[in-house]
A protein has these predicted regions:
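Predominantly extracytoplasmic/ectodomain segments of secreted and cell-surface proteins
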Residues: 1-31
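C-terminal edge beta-strand
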Residues: 96-107
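Short, solvent-exposed loop/turn segments at the edges of extracellular beta-sandwich modules
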Residues: 91-95
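Low-complexity "stalk/linker" and mucin-like segments enriched in Ser/Thr/Pro/Ala/Gly
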Residues: 41-68
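Short strand-edge motifs at loop-to-beta-strand transitions and within beta-strands
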Residues: 69-73
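Short, conserved beta-strand segments of beta-strand-rich sandwich/propeller modules, principally
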Residues: 83-87
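Surface-exposed, short loops/turns at beta-strand junctions within beta-sandwich domains
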Residues: 75-82
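Extracellular acidic loop/turn motifs
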Residues: 24-35, 43-47
């Protein structure tokens, strides 16, 4: 398991799309496949919906990411002043499974 370096943030009243770039973890010609699982760790304050592998290219933090090299999901809720951990699990075409913890700060 790895911990994403960037802490994402959202306002408690917002519903936001979160995207995660896996380009640097994928081997040459490897892609993300199958279903994506997202789960909040420790509490149930957040509502996490619509997890999936992006079917087209997307831009994440100013970087163009190829189709099937990133995942996205929607997050709502949370209490202001708290930092949450969201675990993302996704499989690849080379039979790897990535499990990553993302930090989400609610302001």
């Amino acid at each position: 398991m790895s911990l994403a370096l960037q802490i994402r943030s959202k306002d408690a009243s917002e519903t936001r799309k979160v995207s995660v770039d896996y380009t640097d973890k994928l081997e040459s010609s490897e892609t993300l496949t199958g279903s994506v699982t997202v789960a909040e760790q420790t509490t149930s304050d957040l509502t996490l919906t619509s997890p999936g592998v992006n079917s087209g290219s997307v831009t994440i933090n100013g970087r163009t990411v190829a189709a099937s090299a990133s995942v996205s999901f929607t997050v709502a809720g949370g209490s202001a002043g708290k930092v949450y951990t969201v675990q993302v699990t996704v499989s690849t075409s080379n039979s790897q499974t990535f499990v990553d913890d993302l930090k989400l700060q609610v302001v």
